[in-house]
């Protein structure tokens, strides 16, 4: 295969749930995509595909980054458009999990597959080698499995499975495409039933089901125990089954039962009678609105196995068990569970024990190393830590001893002893800085990935491995450690997804405080990372950014704001800000004095009075709060006008102040899954860190481009920015953030978050190489003025009268309108940035003086969600 092989066009065969969503994610990544389905029996031959595309629009969360993207999926059918397959570099089959149906389709399309194309099946567990037999022999070297997890846009994992004929370079090309273009985490799996993630994840669910029945625990109690307390999705176990679909889960378990007859746990690959009863009834979970759970009105009901009726969910976790689960140290957590006699604790230990036992026995059969198994479970099932990571963190030898003791006592689900490599006296785990463990085959046998020598290191060759080969290092008597993939695409991941046992060395420190750290990697680019929870912005963070800009200007060529984990920033530290307001209020009634001061002193920006003049009548920390707001604005402006380019590397939430800092940077580099917005209305204030000013300025710039006879009408361009801020809208993707105006056309969208820092650095280098100069300060910004304010108020009055917004929402909206329209001036008036910043600050402080804003802030701090009062 040519080294410059490019995947330019992709065909997806099958417009079912998975096929349509895979096609959607391909166009999310700007890949030209054809979606095939059987022709409709009546009307438009593409009717079946078009129906599937309509269905995409109804899914929540949305599989498409922007509604406009769906128009880029090209409908096709097997009767009219097979010739179009010749143009495709990658063909993904995603029809139903029937070997006979897939084989028939392969024979039908094979004559139209071009000689350079890759053909891949999205099967979730059927044998890739058996599927390959239906393909012409001369094409089998370009055939493999490519298992996306549902939903494809959001689930990071893709399993890549070769057949015996698959060319190693083909897999390398495909992995590169999946990782960098589609943003996926790829695990090379062996051709065993259900591959890696489903094999372990489904077994974990079966073990949970088994022990829940043994300890007589309700479904809702099990979910309360096996969700966030264990670092797993909130949907936990049985709620996850409802989301997946009980029929789908039954199919996966059936695959294990039929194809894993020699598995020591085979007797447990059965579903209980109640499960079959629900499936036969058509109670399949979320898609049928009833399964193990059922929502009745606003209440969640759960199936009670004792009565066979649904009851109100009322899960209760024992206080003692809850204390154990809150323990962060896995060694203490597992010991606490094993030693606590409460059924809930014994249930959890039993599940951990049997999952560890299963992973240890199956590792060499299903995966190429322990790292692949752990990452597959993390990326495919949403666990914070993989099974081996947890075992290693809890103390390898201690846990191995517990498992062995329980096996000997007949407590485990299978009586097969642990493999010998597990109990090597020197073993402390499976993950090291040098690599992750790979079990050695028995003497005289050939492993699926080749022979392992007893020398210091050896290369093994097999297409199942990344790059077709790997160097195994530090062999033990029973195995070796395999380093991470050496494929060039992974050089773009400066800090790949971290495993316990691996070090993370974040460059050389420039300066560090309790809340920020500035560092560099020796390339002349400074990086600033926050250390606060959710990367919120405190007064100390503001000071840190100002210092970081100074350091960057003095010693570096660029500054990047980047966090090692999402989110980018959840915004201002409300608790710190409000403590600054409220501390002296115990005796002085500060909020009342703020309100009195605002009512007594009438002022405008035009009058030249600073906000401090207004608040002189108020005591306590009001000047401090105003100073913090002014510092927010100073930081935003400093980022915008720094003498070196500033890059916001955004991943996840960028809300409030986090959004404001981003939009002021020279460039934003954002992952597709970035959720950006100015949400201050939720706590009863307006964006005052330059957000209102910046969006008003962007509206003026857009209006300037469409000016007629030197008359600039800002309002048509301002309206959408006002609505975004007044409604607290948050983008559901970086693509939508661009449509909302938070990202500019020059900003970049990245599909793989582990490449974010690499691309941000490349942007910084490119900007610096152009002899970067910051923009000139804007001194003539056209505003919508009093006419714009009146128009926006009229629209809000209609919403108020229609009960779409509250009275306080209206008051907040009026303040936002005044700020963004430039105050009480004529439409088309020209103002400078400081004028708009002063308006921001004034209106923020006046809103902060109101009782209803105070209630919103306090409610948010207490409940973590907005109050609409």
Which sequence ranges carry the predicted segments?
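Short glycine/serine-rich donor-binding loops of glycosyltransferases
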Residues: 659
């Amino acid at each position: 295969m040519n080294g410059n092989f490019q995947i330019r066009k992709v065909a997806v065969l099958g417009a079912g749930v998975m096929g349509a969503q895979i096609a959607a994610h391909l166009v999310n990544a700007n890949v030209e995509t054809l979606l095939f389905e059987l022709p409709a029996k009546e009307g438009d031959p593409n009717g079946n595909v078009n129906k599937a595309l309509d269905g995409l629009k109804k899914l929540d969360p949305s599989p498409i980054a922007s509604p406009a993207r769906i128009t880029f999926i090209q409908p096709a059918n097997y009767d009219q458009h097979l010739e179009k397959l010749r143009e495709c570099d990658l063909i993904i089959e995603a029809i139903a999990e029937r070997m006979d149906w897939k084989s028939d389709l392969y024979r039908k399309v094979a004559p139209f597959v071009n000689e350079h194309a890759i053909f891949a099946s999205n099967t979730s567990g059927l044998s890739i080698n058996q599927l390959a037999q239906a393909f012409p022999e001369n094409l089998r070297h370009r055939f493999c499995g490519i298992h996306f997890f549902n939903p494809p846009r959001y689930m990071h994992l893709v399993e890549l499975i070769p057949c015996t004929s698959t060319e190693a370079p083909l897999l390398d090309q495909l992995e590169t495409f999946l990782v960098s273009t589609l943003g996926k985490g790829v695990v090379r799996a062996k051709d065993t039933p259900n591959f890696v993630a489903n094999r372990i994840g489904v077994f974990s669910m079966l073990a949970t089901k088994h022990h829940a029945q043994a300890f007589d625990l309700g479904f809702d109690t099990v979910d309360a125990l096996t969700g966030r307390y264990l670092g797993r999705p909130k949907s936990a176990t049985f709620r996850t089954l409802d989301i997946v679909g009980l029929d789908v889960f039954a199919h996966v378990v059936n695959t294990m039962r039929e194809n894993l007859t020699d598995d020591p746990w085979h007797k447990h690959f059965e579903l209980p009678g109640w499960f079959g009863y629900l499936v036969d009834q058509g109670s399949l979970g979320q898609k049928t609105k009833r399964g193990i759970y059922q929502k009745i009105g606003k209440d969640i009901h759960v199936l009670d196995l004792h009565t066979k009726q649904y009851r109100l969910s009322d899960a209760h976790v024992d206080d003692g068990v809850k204390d154990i689960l809150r323990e962060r140290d896995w060694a203490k957590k597992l010991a606490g569970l094993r030693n606590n006699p409460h059924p809930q604790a014994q249930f959890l230990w039993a599940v951990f024990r049997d999952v560890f036992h299963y992973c240890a026995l199956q590792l060499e059969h299903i995966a190429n190393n322990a790292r692949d198994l752990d990452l597959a479970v993390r990326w495919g099932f949403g666990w914070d830590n993989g099974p081996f990571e947890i075992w290693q963190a809890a103390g390898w030898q201690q846990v191995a001893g517990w498992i062995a003791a329980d096996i000997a006592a007949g407590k485990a689900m299978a009586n097969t002893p642990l493999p010998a490599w597990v109990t090597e006296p020197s073993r402390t785990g499976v993950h090291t800085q040098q690599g992750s463990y790979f079990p050695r085959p028995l003497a005289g046998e050939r492993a699926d990935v080749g022979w392992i020598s007893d020398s210091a290191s050896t290369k093994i060759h097999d297409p199942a491995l990344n790059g077709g080969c790997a160097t195994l290092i530090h062999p033990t008597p029973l195995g070796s450690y395999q380093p991470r993939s050496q494929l060039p695409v992974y050089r773009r991941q400066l800090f790949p997804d971290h495993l316990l046992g691996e070090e993370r060395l974040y460059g050389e420190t420039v300066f560090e405080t309790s809340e920020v750290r500035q560092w560099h990697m020796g390339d002349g680019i400074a990086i600033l990372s926050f250390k606060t929870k959710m990367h919120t912005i405190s007064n100390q963070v503001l000071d840190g950014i100002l210092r970081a800009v100074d350091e960057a200007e003095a010693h570096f060529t660029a500054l990047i704001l980047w966090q090692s984990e999402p989110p980018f920033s959840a915004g201002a530290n409300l608790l710190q800000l409000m403590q600054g307001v409220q501390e002296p209020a115990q005796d002085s009634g500060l909020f009342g004095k703020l309100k009195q001061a605002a009512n007594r002193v009438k002022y405008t920006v035009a009058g030249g009075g600073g906000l401090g003049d207004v608040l002189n009548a108020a005591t306590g920390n009001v000047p401090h709060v105003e100073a913090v707001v002014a510092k927010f604005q100073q930081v935003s402006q400093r980022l915008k006008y720094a003498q070196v380019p500033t890059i916001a590397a955004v991943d996840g939430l960028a809300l409030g102040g986090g959004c404001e800092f981003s939009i002021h940077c020279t460039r934003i580099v954002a992952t597709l899954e970035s959720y950006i917005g100015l949400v201050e209305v939720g706590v009863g204030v307006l964006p005052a860190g330059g957000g209102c000013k910046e969006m008003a300025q962007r509206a003026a710039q857009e209006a300037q481009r469409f000016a007629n006879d030197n008359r600039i009408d800002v309002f048509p361009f301002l309206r959408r920015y006002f609505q975004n801020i007044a409604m607290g809208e948050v983008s559901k993707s970086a693509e939508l953030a661009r449509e909302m105006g938070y990202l500019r056309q020059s900003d970049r969208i990245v599909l793989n978050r582990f490449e974010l820092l690499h691309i941000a650095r490349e942007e910084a280098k490119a900007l610096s190489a152009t002899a970067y100069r910051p923009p000139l300060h804007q001194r003539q910004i056209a505003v919508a003025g009093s006419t714009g304010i009146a128009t926006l108020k009229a629209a809000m009055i209609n919403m108020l009268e229609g009960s779409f917004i509250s009275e306080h929402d209206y008051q907040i909206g009026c303040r936002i309108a005044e700020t963004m329209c430039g105050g009480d001036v004529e439409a088309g008036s020209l103002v400078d940035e400081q004028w708009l910043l002063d308006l921001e600050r004034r209106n923020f402080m006046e809103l902060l003086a109101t009782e209803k804003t105070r209630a919103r802030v306090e409610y948010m701090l207490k409940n973590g969600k907005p109050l609409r009062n």
